[in-house]
Amino acid sequence: MKIQQAKPPVTQDTSATCPLTSTVQDSSPVAGQLGRPIGFRGLAGGCPVSPQGYESPPLPLGPDSLTWRYFGDWRGMLQGPWAGSMQNMHPQLGAAVEDHSTFFRERWPRLLRSLYPIGGVVFDGDRAPVTGVQVRDYHITIKGVDGAGRRYHALNPDVFYWAHATFFVGTLHVAERFCGGLTEAQRRQLFDEHVQWYRMYGMSMRPVPATWEEFQDYWDHMCRNVLENNFAARAVLDLTELPKPPFAQRVPDWLWAAPRKLLARFFVWLTVGLYDPPVRELMGYRWLRRDEWLHRRFGDIVRLVFALVPFRFRKHPRARAGWDRATGRIPADAPLVQTPARNLPPPDERDNPTHYCPKV
């Protein structure tokens, strides 16, 4: 991805802001005024001001979009540590993960279940805005003060958009590195689609760059001036104690220990190859010309292998169901595919409103 030098400074507002469609009561001065619903207009702070929380009804993406082609592909798992670490490098987002997330207790289930609602914001068709609001509202109560005394709130528009920006750039990475590449026109189309995608959440559009060129400036500014080498980002990259994935539960612990060491080193290397140079420097990694050549050859191998996989089976179940509805394979009103029970939060967390926890 072409990166330009940042021009005007891009601020990271730390004011507490929540969308108007959220109605949970909150008594914290971090989230809002005492005794007011956090959806109260006085707390909107630039969020959309229509009663539904949207400036105009959002139009979901469909099968004619490039986002449907590249997002929800299992190859996206290869950039998972990149996306997680990039998100957590944002100081507010990293603090929220450190203080509130169950990621450190349940790495695999937390990752695998989150793919369902995240994918649904793209692939749920007419129901995508509802899914987007659900995803947004999981974050209502996630707030606090970090170790440096800085306030954070997960629904700060700058923070929420940063997470979405990593989804967009992650989609570019998947297409560029593992799917054969993109033209400049396709990058611009994906940029426009990521804006349409973001509207599904009913969040303020204030932080969203207006053009592809402005987004490149925004991304460069974030990488150079905002992101931090923090505990939450390093924890994503620490794969030395990675538990067995669900499909390998029958593998004895002693047998898993050996490949885990190799996989840990490989996935860190794969992740570093996707970082922008300022992020590599921030996190203390070197990247040689030989590394770049090997990284691209690995991407070529992935592309060739996936060419042998039928299209439907390249897709996550939520994405596959979206395609099946669009092509008439299943009814348009078929129930949305939910995460299996093995991915549910720990029993003591299942009543926590910050978790996606379907009845399965």
Protein language model regions, located:
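Mature, function-bearing regions of proteins
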Residues: 2-3, 8-10, 18-360
